[in-house]
Curated annotation (Swiss-Prot):
The gene is gcvP. This is Glycine dehydrogenase (decarboxylating). Pfam families: GcvP2_C, GDC-P. Keywords: Oxidoreductase, Pyridoxal phosphate. It catalyses: N(6)-[(R)-lipoyl]-L-lysyl-[glycine-cleavage complex H protein] + glycine + H(+) = N(6)-[(R)-S(8)-aminomethyldihydrolipoyl]-L-lysyl-[glycine-cleavage complex H protein] + CO2.
Length: 954
């Protein structure tokens, strides 16, 4: 290629669009922080002993058009068939009003978890609707705001049963009619907690001495049976019973709660979320009110703001890993908020009557198929069903299965039986095609007429739902597309996302989620593939996964990857399991001590506890580094039982620890393994790797470094990379040929496969040079912010040359002593200036951790720094007595439009200062919709269901 052609190429355009500061602005920033060049800044920041000697061996950057063309080749290798496999995954129609206005809308998918409720009221309302939907359909008293998938929800339910129950047994019963993938994930969780799993016939449950039980309703083979007596008998034996159920079936069937279930779990996938080869989808958990504080996951509750107006928030956060650490109810952080919102809106759009019609149509099609097959001489395994039937096909099984495949139809093979599951997309033509496969001559119309006289004959009368559901006005208002569009926009407008401004959350990497990366996610070639379809139908997914894993190995210095974990916490869990299985394979299963620095994220100790490790905390020194002397003492004390150490790099204190290789060597010398948390991988890519540093295993947060959007609290992905000696211990899956114990951690082999194209696209469009440049710019942005703020705020940790990594910690503690203003006051005041707050009080209480990422431009960085400096000046006015401590712009923040419109203004500062505190806010203003939320009131007066419509009107 000539020099001119090269200069005109679009090949590297994306890098400049992804990174915020252009070359000219980068030079200004370097001058401002007294750095000669970007490379010299990196030399001053990143220890020489961990720097890579060679660049990564990755392909050159692709243009957006070339990337999409390459992605199309992957997609075209997938084959969309008529799929009737079921097993927890179903085709569904995503209402286009939801597809366009939520799934494809950065206002919804770029928001963060709603820890700052004043700027999150929209998605909090939607998630509250989700909880109400789940409670109504399951007949339970309280629900959470989503879990990762149905199988992990079942594993979480098992631990809830143990915590909440009174049985002294250590055995958990699983009915053999539970989905196979769920059974395997439950077995994994049980093994490492120390529970025994007993898989048996459902009717044997009352005889068992078990602390908990898991049953499926309808069963995996489709049978619908009354569980009421079985549940009562089990509960009489101190057994808590979890029912894995189906939300659409619950529109017609007696719900699990009315049969006495203690816990109900399942997946909301079929409520408008594509199968996507396994995910992401929102799982749900609902339980009795008395178990609410042992229920894992986020729970949305109703509270009030400082003016007494209704406000929503995340409730009961003291249960969660970021507070309780190794004593938490679960290690779950990121759940599936975006998918829960889609399912919630599906229920809002259709309403109770719409859902009932969809359920009736699905059931009627199934009843027609069952009647035709029966008349055609086939025997059904059971005659009570909702949407799934199992046919005893005997010696004909293989031939019929092959005949179906030849007709582009996927059935479920169950030994000498074939399973068929219908859904809302099933048509008369589908039924006729199945009749042709089975050689049935019956007419669909005639069968429909025959069934119409007793439409629900296949549902025993005692199991037909009689109670109402989705009666709240929100489910009975927005049924035209105009109404729905406006409701979605109304909620979106309440929330702060990357469409509004920088979200400088430390340790969260809220970088650009580029439109080109997102486009393939909605292609049907990725969305319409069943996770258990024959492998040749998912060849595109296999090729994409293989290439992505190779790229991730190159980026991390690892030898093998698993894409199965569907969150960062799940990746941690899979990584520690790999370590423990490795020790067991060497006859050292007694190694159970996990060393964790005091600065670690709360998931680390919570995850270690989930694999029955003993957590031993290692001190950090005054510079934020691991205290090597204390580490040596802890290693010496626990040498014989040392399993591993969990570290984060750069550390959660925002510095590159110079002795990190020494730390790894010390642990290895004592027979331990090194787990390097990949949360801060955005500061490593192209400069160093976990493998080069000396780590044995890491998870990567693809929703941080590799551009999968946070979705307002999920989805995420946490694939794990390992050195070769740990590769045999990566999670397997029954649907991928794993025999015996497979140690699955997710319901599907490839986890949340349909969002993998996002990360592949990012890597492809950045190329080696672009990825490395992004890391350097992230470090530049963080150091620029740090130097701008340092004259006004104490910076807690810096490296030996005075630099920080990709984030910095601002210490508010001495300023609070001096002025009385807290880190929370600053966080809330930033909303008035048009910003989401930095991370509060992590990893050090009383601090703010700022991570600007590489995607923020100089103008936005300056706007943030100007806001922080102005807030510091406001603090000084409080200190000097110009404003009282209990009545000033900081403690009254955030300010709303209602404040601006008040007839009386009893504050010692102007309306303008309160509501438009900067020049930038006068040209464009984001408005919080509620004042500061009262967290204490919300937990003392716990309401986790939709409040009366009167509350919204007030």
């Amino acid at each position: 290629m000539t020099e001119l052609l090269q200069s005109l190429s679009t090949q590297n355009e994306f890098v400049a669009r992804h990174n915020g500061p252009n070359k000219s602005d980068q030079q200004k920033m370097l001058e401002a922080i007294n750095a000669v060049s970007l490379d010299s800044l990196i030399d001053e920041t990143v220890p020489a002993q961990i720097r890579l000697e060679q660049p990564m061996n990755l392909a050159e950057a692709k243009s957006e058009a070339d990337m999409l063309a390459a992605m199309r080749k992957f997609a075209d290798q997938n084959q969309i068939k008529r799929t009737f496999i079921g097993q927890g995954y179903y085709n569904t129609f995503t209402p286009n009003v939801i597809l366009r206005n939520v799934m494809e809308n950065p206002g919804w998918y770029t928001a963060y978890t709603p820890y700052q409720p004043e700027i999150s009221q929209g998605r909090l309302e939607s998630l509250l609707n989700y909880q109400q939907m789940v409670m109504d359909l399951t007949g339970m008293e309280i629900a959470n705001a989503s879990l990762l998938d149905e199988a992990t929800a079942a594993a979480e339910a098992m631990t809830l049963c143990k915590r909440a129950g009174k049985s002294k047994s250590n055995v958990f019963f699983v009915a053999d009619d539970v989905h196979p993938q769920t059974i395997e994930v439950v077995k994994t969780r049980a093994k490492f907690i120390g529970f025994e799993v007993l898989v048996g016939a459902l009717d044997s449950l009352p005889e068992q001495d078990v602390f908990g039980a898991l049953v499926q309703y309808p069963g995996t083979t489709g049978e619908v049976r009354d569980l009421t007596d079985l549940i009562a008998k089990a509960q009489a034996n101190k057994t808590l019973v979890t029912v894995a159920t189906d939300l659409l079936a619950s529109a017609l069937l007696k719900p699990a709660g009315e049969m006495g279930a203690d816990v109900a779990i399942g997946s909301a996938q079929r409520f408008g979320v594509p199968m996507g080869y396994g995910g992401p989808h929102a799982a749900f958990m609902a339980t009795r009110d008395k178990h609410k504080r042992t229920m894992p996951g986020r729970v949305i509750g109703v509270s009030i703001d400082t003016n007494g107006n209704q406000a929503l928030r995340m409730a009961m956060q003291t249960r969660e890993q970021h507070i309780r650490r190794e004593k938490a109810t679960s290690n779950i952080c990121t759940a599936q908020a975006l998918l829960a919102n889609m399912a919630s809106f599906y229920a809002v759009f259709h309403g109770a009557e719409g859902l009932r019609t969809i359920a009736r149509r699905t059931h009627h099609m199934t009843a027609i198929l069952a009647a035709g097959l029966t008349k055609g001489g086939f025997e059904l395994a059971h005659n009570s069903f909702f949407d799934t039937i199992t046919i005893n096909t005997g010696a004909q099984t293989e031939d019929l299965y092959a005949k179906a495949l030849a007709a582009d139809i996927n059935l479920r093979k169950l030994g000498t039986q074939l399973g068929v599951s219908f859904d809302e997309t099933t048509t008369v033509a589908d039924v006729e095609a199945l009749f042709a496969v089975f050689g049935v001559k019956e007419e669909v119309a005639a069968l429909s007429t025959e069934i119409a006289g007793n439409e629900f004959a296949a549902i025993p009368e005692a199991l037909r739902r009689t109670t109402e559901y989705l009666t709240h006005p929100v489910f009975n208002t927005h049924h035209s597309e105009t109404q729905m569009m406006r409701y979605l926009k109304q909620l979106e407008n309440k929330d702060f996302s990357l469409t509004h401004g920088m979200i400088p959350l430390g340790s969260c990497t809220m970088k650009l989620n580029a439109a080109a990366e997102m486009i393939p996610v909605t292609w049907p070639e990725f969305g319409s593939i069943h996770p258990f379809a024959p492998a040749d139908q998912a060849a595109g997914y296999a090729a994409l996964a293989k290439d992505l894993k190779e790229k991730l190995c190159e980026i991390t210095g690892y030898d093998a990857f698993s894409l199965q974990p569907n969150s960062g916490a799940s990746g941690e869990y899979a990584g520690l399991i790999a370590i423990q299985r490795y020790h067991e394979s060497r006859g050292e299963g007694h190694r159970n001590v996990c060393l964790i620095p005091s600065s670690a994220h709360g998931t680390n100790p919570a995850t270690a506890s989930m694999v029955s490790m003993k957590v031993v905390v290692v001190k950090c020194d005054e510079e934020g580094n691991i205290d090597v002397t204390d580490l040596a003492a802890k290693i010496k004390k626990h040498k014989d039982n040392l399993s591993s150490i969990m570290i984060t790099y750069p550390s959660t204190h925002g510095v590159y620890e110079e002795q990190v290789k020494e730390v790894c060597e010390m642990v290895h010398a004592a027979g331990g393994q090194v787990y390097l948390d990949g949360a801060n991988m955005n500061a490593q890519v192209g400069l160093t790797t976990p493998g080069f540093i000396g780590s044995d295993v890491s998870h990567l947060n693809l929703h941080k470094t590799f551009c999968i959007p946070h979705g307002g609290g999920g989805p995420g992905m946490g694939p794990i990379g390992v050195k070769s000696h740990l590769a045999p211990f990566l999670p397997g899956h029954i649907e991928n040929g794993a025999d015996g114990e497979n140690f699955a951690v997710s319901a599907a082999d490839m986890g949340s496969a349909s969002i993998l194209p996002i990360s592949w696209a990012y890597i492809a469009m950045m190329g080696e040079a672009g990825l490395t440049d992004a890391t350097k710019v992230a470090i530049l942005n963080a150091n620029y912010v740090m130097e701008q703020l340092r004259p006004h705020y104490p910076v807690l940790y810096r490296g030996s040359n005075g630099r920080v990594a990709h984030e910095c910690i601002i210490d508010i503690r001495p300023l609070k002593e001096e002025t009385g203003i807290s880190e929370e006051d600053i966080a809330k005041r930033l909303m008035d200036y048009g910003f989401h707050a930095p991370t509060m009080s992590f990893p050090v209480a009383g601090t703010l951790m700022v991570e600007p990422t590489e995607s923020e431009d100089l103008e936005e960085l300056d706007r943030f720094c100007d806001a922080m400096i102005a807030i510091r000046e406001e603090m000084t006015k409080v200190k000097n007595g110009e404003w009282p401590l209990d009545n000033n712009p900081l403690v009254n923040a955030p300010h709303t439009q209602f404040d601006l419109a008040k007839e009386e203004w009893d504050r010692p500062y102007s309306r303008e200062l309160g509501c438009f505190p900067s020049k930038a806010t006068k040209s464009w203003k984001y408005w919080p919709t509620v004042n500061r939320v009262d967290n204490v009131y919300g937990d003392r007066n716990l309401i986790c269901s939709c409040p009366s419509i009167d509350n919204y009107e007030d």
